[in-house]
């Protein structure tokens, strides 16, 4: 659905396409030889600031970026830490809200007139483009946080004039205040628009909470809008991005790189929609369903008339961009994509006319008034209404990407089936639209409101709790059983971590609930140590069977995996001299293999997990960069990441029993030895001559190797910010604080997917 068309970052995003440029995190400073510094023997770094005040990033552009671990902190939220969106939403009259949105849709404003007297097409595009940035690789993007309000999304060329749609909705947002988030409103508007034009939607879930600053997302390496450096061949573009060109949601509607070839376009449509978790049928349904309504806008040449995007617009524009000097600049004179296409002769009514018109004509290439490549029906009568003049009609027109649905063999088969079976098409579009709007929201348990349908497979469903939950006495007895089972602390901790740390905060997927670590594909992931995992699960399943057979309360394997890890943490703390109780809240259930889409879960397999000192073979990105990205996925702060690394090293949670970073002679005991030995004087670190990313810590006096460690371990002594945190935990008075903080961070990870506890 479209109305248009750095070098190595110190972030995990984008490193794949930049690996050839070298190490994404430089371990030496960037210097300018021959520059004048206080000491002429020392090269000075060359800052790159473009005239603005210089920051650390300008001086050291490859410095490890920890800022992502403090994005959208409570300090930037004007609603305060006590604000609970679910509680405010409960006060909302959703039917009244829907009526007010319909009023907006059908009340044309002079400052931005409605096409055909209805803003439905505009609002569908608004919602689509809010949700359509989602990508399966890392779960980033999507409509879940209202990020379209901020740069860069608010100024993408594919989002041209959606600022007007958001402004049209402002009176509704103003009226209901915090009872409805912008994130919910942006996608609800399109849903209501469909219903107001006669379409039966599949459902809708509220529950998206607003952010107050944009998420730092790598959208591509290009430094120009609609740049296409991401192409590595005529038929391939790099992994990790969702669109074919910078600033687009999916593909260029004129065709790949502006080449009006519907067959070539189909290849990239399929790939971009796959990266958003859509199959061929969903793709066809979405394109045809969305293009049943509204029109594109290309009344004139944009370069001659259209002003800057919102982020570049002057103060007096007040957040509006793309102001046009072409005639009135709006309505019939509007310029958005430069394309001038109205797909059907009923652009404000649900129908099957998109397919009927697509297959009724042969099509020839033409040029829009805005200079864009589009297609017009050969030998056709003018049957398409004008958006503003009831006396005018136009010949049918289509985009290059519309014709892909007829030219591509697989798409054509689906399209003809939908042409002949309108009800089947309507249901397919309803389900695909629902998936589009909700793909990044996680499980249905997070959804609010009265219109939520039954859970779908792509929502990773788990069964409801159907048994009495364990109490304190049961928990104590189960812990004792686990600790007497013969399983080691390292085995129990590693298994609990493997189960819980699959979570992605970006799209709320993964986590311990469901115990999917015992199912395909997770049970076979190298990072989860399949042989050890099978041993641990077999033992825990035996404990579970015995306990549940006694009658009364029961425990799921999902709960027992977490409880067993927590029991091991408590024992390790006790062995260190500290009595602690790791908080535990039963209520997880066990998913089945039938409830688990193997292909869908495959994207959750980590390329690295620094917490377990794991790096996938052949991985080119720097381990410490990937550690920060993993911490971000787990919604951790820098201090939480730090204390977890130290604790997990002490507990020997490394994959494969690796000794790297286990800087203690008391393994299995929850001590702060990792930090004290990492920062100890009288030693030096040396890169291993035989193993990449491995370092040796040697005694300065004897040059003997005392420990080995990974780059992930060393970064806590090398990076100045992380070293400051490590020093806290290495201090003499920090032993108890270390244990307390580790338990808190551990519990947070174990409960990341317990949305019912919020």
Swiss-Prot record:
User: What is the superkingdom listed in this entry's lineage?
Assistant: Bacteria
InterPro entries in alphabetical order = Catalase_peroxidase, Haem_peroxidase, Haem_peroxidase_sf, Peroxidases_AS, Peroxidases_heam-ligand_BS
Q: Does the entry feature the keyword Oxidoreductase, yes or no? A: yes
List every stretch annotated Disordered. Answer: 1-59
Listed GO cellular component terms?
cytosol
The active-site annotation reads 129
The annotated crosslink position for Tryptophyl-tyrosyl-methioninium (Tyr-Met) (with W-128) is 250-276
What are the GO BP annotations of this UniProt entry?
A: cellular response to hydrogen peroxide; hydrogen peroxide catabolic process
Reported cofactor(s): heme b
**Enzyme Commission identifier(s):** 1.11.1.21
- What residues bind heme b, as annotated? 291
The UniProt record lists the Tryptophyl-tyrosyl-methioninium (Trp-Tyr) (with M-276) crosslink at 128-250
Kindly state what the record says about how the cofactor is bound.
Answer: Binds 1 heme b (iron(II)-protoporphyrin IX) group per dimer.
User: A Gene Ontology molecular-function term?
Assistant: catalase activity
Family annotation (HAMAP family)? Catal_peroxid
The record's NCBIfam families line, in alphabetical order, gives:
cat_per_HPI, PRK15061.1
Q: Which family does it belong to?
A: Belongs to the peroxidase family. Peroxidase/catalase subfamily.
Subunit and interaction comment: Homodimer or homotetramer.
What is the protein name stated in its UniProt record?
A: Catalase-peroxidase
Query: Could you tell me which species this protein originates from?
Result: Salinispora arenicola (strain CNS-205)
Report which gene this protein is encoded by. Answer: katG
